[in-house]
Every structure is written in C-alpha cells, then in structure tokens.
Amino acid sequence: MRTKHLLLLLFLIAFGTSAVAQEQDLSPWTDNPHGNEWIDYSKKYVRVGITQDGIYKIPLATLRSRLGNDLTGNNVQAWFRGKQIALQIDGDNVVFYGRKNDGVSDGLMFRPGPQARLDYTTSFFSEEGAHFFTIAKDSDPILRISSLSAVPASDGPATESFHIETVVKNNSAWLTAGANANRRVGIPFAHRAEFSIQSLNNSFYQRHNAFIKLLETDQVWDETIDLKDFVTGTGENVTLKFSIHGDGPGERNVEVFMAPEESQLTEIDKRFLSSNLSGLSAISDSRTVVPGTNITEAGKGFLRFRSTTTPNNSLTFRNRFGVSYYTVSFPQSLSFSEQSSKKYYFKAKGTGKSKLRITSISSGDKVYDISDKNSPVLLTGTLSGGNLDLEVNRVADKPLVLQVVSSSGITEPAAGVFYDVKFDLLYSFKTGDKIDNVKPEPADYDYLVITHNATGAKQVREGAVEFAKYRATPDGGEYNPLVISTRSIYDQFNYGEPSPVAIGRFVNYMIQSGIKTTHNVLLVGHGVGRIDNIIKEIPSDVPTFGDPGSDVLLVSGLSNDPASNIDVPSVPIGRISAFTNQQVLNYLAKVEEYERQTREESASNLSWRKKVLNLIGNKTSDEPQSFNTFVTSAENQIPTSTGPWDVSRVSNEAKLPPVGNFEREPAPIESYMNDGLGMLTYYGHGDYSGTIYNIGYASERFQQTSKRYPLVYITGCGVGDVYSSHSGLFVASDWIIAQDKGAIAMYANTFLAYTNTAAAYMKLLYAQIFQKTDATRRTVGGIQVNMARIFTGSSSNARVSATDQEIANVHQTSLFGDPALRILLTSDVPLPVSYIDFSGSVLDNANIQLQWETATEKDNDHFIVERSFDGKTFEMIGKVPSKGPSDLGGNRYNFLDASPKAGINYYRLKQVDKAASGGQAFGYSNIISVDFKVRSQNTLISVFPNPGSDKVLITSDRGDIIKSWKLYNSIGAVVSKGQETTVDISNLSSGIFILEVVTSNDIVTRKKIIKER
C-alpha cells in the first residue's frame, strides 16, 4: 500500500480506434466486431503460421493429407485476417504471399487509442501470421494470383532508378535458447513497474510502453549506419525515425546525433534532437538526414542516442530512458544482386505508369505486385542482359510494392507451423460432452469457462470441464455452461493470433443476444501479464490484460453491452489461477460444500457467516491512527438491519518499532479461520509475496476442519499479483486452490493500493455487501461489476469523477474464484421478486434511461414505474410487464423517461403480483435519483482542425455565442483560457487536452483536442 495521497482531476476520454498510426491497419478488427464472420463452420481448416513476409509454397499433398483427398488445385482456398487471399497453383504446389504477425491488434490494448502504440515494429505476443487453408464449396468464389504483362512500351514514362528502402532496428527480439527461450526475459521494457519508484502503472498500455535499449544518464547508444546501394541526386530525402521512452519518474535531457564520422557525434550541427523527456513520457519523431552533413555521400555514418542529465548518485535509475526502435528510409537502387527475396517500395503518386529496371536478375526469378497483399499479381516484363524492364499501372494515391524472389526464395513452411483447426467446445451443457467444429450460439450459453491448451501435467481442462458440469446441475444453479480453449478463441475471434484482445471479442460475441443476469466468465488456469515473461504465442496461459495484470479489462467496454464503459466489466469475471487439474478440483469441492451448506444447514449453523474480521497491517508509527479511521469508516457501512453482524478487528500496531519487528509478523487468525468467518479483510501493506501482517499460505497454516470458508478482501500492494511468472505459488492463488482450506473467493490488488483509494473502495464494497439482504446481494462477480460502475462514476448513484488512481484500483482488483458465487447466505428460502440493481442515467441529453435487474421472480405480473420531483409524491409514468419467472434466475429491464425535468428526478418501482383471491399484492423498490442537467451535445460545438499544431477554431453548430473557454492538460491543470473563438496551441507540447467551452446560455461542452508536433 502506498501512503502518498494524489488528488488529480481525470477527464474521461472515449478511447476509440478512429485515429491510428499509418503503419497500423486495424480494419480486420474495426470492420468485424467479433472476428468469426469469415468462418464456414461446415468446413475443415488447417492453420499455417508464417513468421516472415514473403512468397511461400506448400505441396498440395501436404494440404490433402490434412484436409482430405477432395482437395485439388481448383478448390483450395486460403484466408488471412478474415479476408480470402489469392493463391497460385504452380504444378503440385500452392504458392501464396505470406505475412508475419505485425502485432497490430496490440494497439487495441493502448490508451488513448492505437496511435499510442509507438513501436509498430513489434508484436507483444506472437510472431506467427495465421493463414487458414480449406476446401472451397462449389458455390464459393475462388481467388487466384493473376498474371499480367508489364512489358514496357517504347514511348512510356522515364525509367525510375530507385525505390525507398527502410532499415529497421528494434530492441524486442525473442530469446532463442536456454531456459528463457521464446520469452524476452532481461530485455528492458519501459515501463516495467517497480514498487520503489512508480506511483502509478496502468494495466492498459500507453505511449511510453515499449521494449527498449536501456540507457542510464551517463551512457550512450551508438550505431553504425551503412545504407546499402544508396542512390544520391534523386530528390528524395533520407529520413530517420525514432522513438525514445522514459523508464523512470525523473527528468532527463535526451539528444540524438547523426554524423559521417564518429568523432563528430558531439557537434551541434549534427544534433537532430535536444529535448526534455519527463517521467514516463515518450518522444516519437523523424528527421531529414542530409548527405555530407549527417552521412557520407556513400550512405555511411554514425548514430548516437544519449542523455545530458547529470547523474544523481544512487538515484540515476530514476532518470533512465531507452530507445525502442529507429528506422532509416532512403533511396536505394533497384538491384537484386545476391538476393533470394527482396521487397521494393515505390511511393504513392497519381494515376499513370511507372517504368522500372531491376538489375542483376535472372530468368528464373519472379516479380509479384503485392500492393494489394490479399491479391498479388505475377508480372512479366522484358529481360535482357540481367536487367528486367517493367511498366506497371499505378493506382492513384497508393504505393506500388513489388516482391522479387528467386526459386530458392520461395520457401516451404516448416512442418511444425501446421496444425488442424478445431473450432471446438471442450464441454457444452447441451450434449454433456465435447463438440468439435461448432459455432457457439450466443443465446444458448451464459456461463463461459475459458481454459488454455497446455497438455500433460500442466493441463487443467479436465478440472474446467468438471466445474462447468457442476454449474449445469440444479445444485450448481442450472446455468448453461460451455468450456472453450484459448486456442479455439484465438482461431475464431482473433484470426488465429494469440492476444488478450481475443477473449474480449469472444465474450462480446457471446453477449450479442443480450446480457443475462446469469452471464459469467470463469478463467481456469494461470496467466502471465508481465510483458518480458510472456511466452511467445501464449501456448499455455489464459492471458490477463496488460501489466499489471487486469482480468477486469479483458471484458470491459464491450460493444454489445448497452451500458458499455471502458473501465467497467460488461459481465462478471473471475479466475481460478491453477497449475493442475487437482487444484481446480480442490476449489470445486469448496464451492460445492459452501453451496451445500446454504441449501441444507440451518440459519443457526450458518451464523459464522455473520462474522467479519478486519486485519490492519501498519508499517510506520504514524499509520495506526489513520488506518483505524479508514477501517472504522468501512465498518460503519455495516447496518444492524441485515445482521446481526459480529465484527472484530486485529492490528499489528503493538509490533511496530521500537517495540517489535512488524515484518511478516504472523497475523493471529487461526482460531477465526477454524471457527468460521463470513468475511476476512486486510487493510494495510503487502507485496506479491504476501501481507506485512502475514496471513500466510492457507495450505500450510490452517486446519479448517469445519470447512467454513470466508470471502477475503486484501488491499495490500501487489498481493493479488499472480501474473508475474509461470512458476511458484502466490498467496492469492493458494487461498483459492488449497484443499479444504483458505477462502471461497478473494478480491485482491495486483499492483499498488493507495491509502485513500483503498479506503474509499473498501467503504463502498462494505455497502455493496452488508447493506444488502440475502435476496438482494449480488454474486461476488456482480458485486465487482457494481463496484466498478460506482467507483468510476458511471452509474446514477456513483461518486464524483474518479482519479487515475481510483480507476487503476478498479482495473487492478482481481476476483479469484467463481464469479457466480453468492456469499454470506444464511438461508435457502425461496425468494420473492428481489432486485439486484436499480439505476438510471441521462441518455442523449434528453431522456433518462432506467435499468433494473431482478435476482428472482415468483408470481410477478408487472412493474409500475413511478417518478417524483420532491422525493415524496410519486406518480405513475409507465408500466413494464414481467418477463418471469425465468429459468435463468432473474431478468433485466429497461424503461425510458422521455420527459424528465431539469434537476433531481426520483424514481421507484412498484412490483405487482399476479391476481389472487385476495387481490393483487405489491411492493416497492428502493428510491433512486438522477440529476438531469441540460447540457449541449458535443456535436453542437466544433473544433477545427483537430488534431492540430497551431491554432484551432471554436464554432457553434447552432450559432451560440462563445462566452469563455479553458484548456486543460491530462492531469486537469488549466494551461490556457480565453473568450475569443481561436485557441492558440502552438506553444504546447504534443498530447491530449480537454477544451471546456461555455456558451452565452451557460451550456458547458467539453471536447478532446489532440496537439500534433
């Protein structure tokens, strides 16, 4: 836990995919919301992984052995990222243009959007581009590589003598040997957070996140530049592009030099950049390289990156920085000398033709126009004396890209990159067994179990299936479960590319028919988020989102969620972080026992569930007073009306220096655990190895012969970080998977927990748990969803705007255990209509949308929606018929109030039973309030140009007079203000700003402005 208090205003920005870096084509993801639109589930597919762009061949016999004897050269098809790609049948081989995984979908994990992914040369998770081969049906269109004569005309355009070559140097190569093969262990990542120096590290990636060549303040990185076949006098610039990243919270002045001679690397006229790089920021820039000044006329020179910041003794690590990549683009001659495969890039121009001469080429070499990578064209020209002359039609404003290959350059993929695709479900409640090659129907399932593909001792699939089978039984709640592997998810919903993004796309697909109150996602298996410890292709993980790990962000902001919010999980999600089947079964046995007790035991026998123990783990002598105050505030949320509750508190205050040694002092909780607790909370310090006031490993410490398992909430920094490595046992996972011991579920922080933030979260959590009855309390996963809505300010009853620490706390509070679990129940009495949630929100600045969920419905006929403007006198404004009773438990309802009044609107629901001999009975929900403020829609205020670099103009679409404006930076500080309609941003650093505009009628509008360099 960090005791530094930060009060920052955070403007919530809609993180979209509209502005992406030019190198990143996200259309397969933005055009296809789920990713499986291209699949014909009646076909067989074989996946072929390609790690380098180029021309490849596969024997038809190889494909036939996997797809069947019906495959011929006439009916073979292939797909890449949801698009059919053209093939060439060359004798007994299929020839195609193959592509590596460029990591473009990693951009979907960056904020404020994919444009923040500065190092576009690196994929975080994979190298393999997935190419799917299949047999076409008779009616299917077939794409083939066409041949085109490109013989030059005698009166054509002048011959072009060069293309633009780009040399790429990055610092993210996967290790190839040793114990860490296929990882990036030891390769610095900006920023891999350390508790000692980092005040905040978001789980989503940001501009500063990249693998780097790490430099201390007294170090330099020198590179030798040698531009092969450099052509001068073309009129085209040589361009250096680079990205520099801060790796600590300090300040540093970074410099970039380029010179013909190494001895000139300190000369001012050779310096491209001298700029302050503050904290965890990044500089992505380009410079024109001048032959004779920065390189020789032959294209040779030296490149240097350095910092001029004076080292500060032992704190030099605070000023660290690094270079993620650099590229040099330059005019290069059209020579194929000593090449087996070569790409030639010609810049975009208007319509017309390009006449080219490629030298040092032989008769067996082939030239493909790959400008459209999905549909290459085989070109033929005039070959004479080792020179190939071509005249190629140009597409207006599009680059021309050619791939030249020799016969040896057309390679056959290794056998290990082929595998037979199975769009399978490891389990479906519909059959009670596995189903191969099936399209999961969203309306059929609500309990989604995701596990990985590891085999042997590390496989946990059998345990995952057993868990799903239990949830399908009456005792388990009669859910409609499926079990699916990450491999199947990658293939169906992410074009075969491993990524955490795939899980969100799968869940988004599964909720397209509507989110049910019974929807849950259970991750079964370990997952690593620490970026330098991820295994290439993620073969044996159920991945988490980002680093620090966040399971919440896997399912947040899904487009099929009507209440979509990027910081709020669309459905409840939990994880069993197990390494073996037995560990999964250990937890299943605890869940079965916990729910058996609810069904079969008396309220008196379940009275232990009314016991709460609050542990306090202090670290310094000034903390007990404030920590006790925070815990008292949370305890005050426990009412007597839902009790009686038996609340105890234990602190390590007496063990603090100078009296004793607080480090890892065992917390005296054995008797509490053995007798039974409903909930155990730890408020205090911790790290990934445990809590300061040590609760220890449940598997080693407790007897718990009574099999009474508590819900556990831990605020200690990093105690929930089970995502850092593939080995070892973590406290958070041990308490879940320990046999007959530990917790029934746990909320725990995966990174930093700040005192104020943790205290506020704990207070709200206690309200969500203890102020609810057995009938109205949500599942542990549902509670987490509610907490996210309230804590981030995205529900009608929410707090004021959240700080970045508070939002990070939501992301980095993981739920370990089954999200469908209902806790603290002391009876199994059939429930009347009970509400899980009742909330309202302003919609389109004109309406108020009401939403409510019922946990159960019995003999319910309809709801009457009532509104009040004083909170006392209510009137009927609508009637909503019941959807129940539902086999799925409860239902979700919506109602639109199209005529709210400005100010506070109060609402309640009148639930009316079906008619009986004594007339219709009814009951009321709680009362909620929605503040309806008349505000303009963002579309009424326009800002142009945006992005911009100099001045931007404010206009009102309906002619309102601009009264005043303020411009805020990303931390809420005012950087400029005025009353005119022009905003000068020329002197501001590049980044994202919020413009707040007030018009003459006092309507306030906020617009996001992007400042470019």
Language model: regions and residue ranges:
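Short, flexible loop/turn segments at beta-strand junctions in immunoglobulin-like
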Residues: 392-394, 897-901, 985-987
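Bacterial Sec-dependent N-terminal signal peptides
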Residues: 1-25, 747, 798-800, 946
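Cysteine-dependent hydrolase recognition
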Residues: 22-828
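Short, compositionally biased serine/threonine- and acidic-rich segments at solvent-exposed termini, linkers
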Residues: 412-416, 824-938
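Surface-exposed, proline-anchored Ser/Thr-rich loop/turn motifs
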Residues: 439, 832-857, 925-958, 967-973, ...
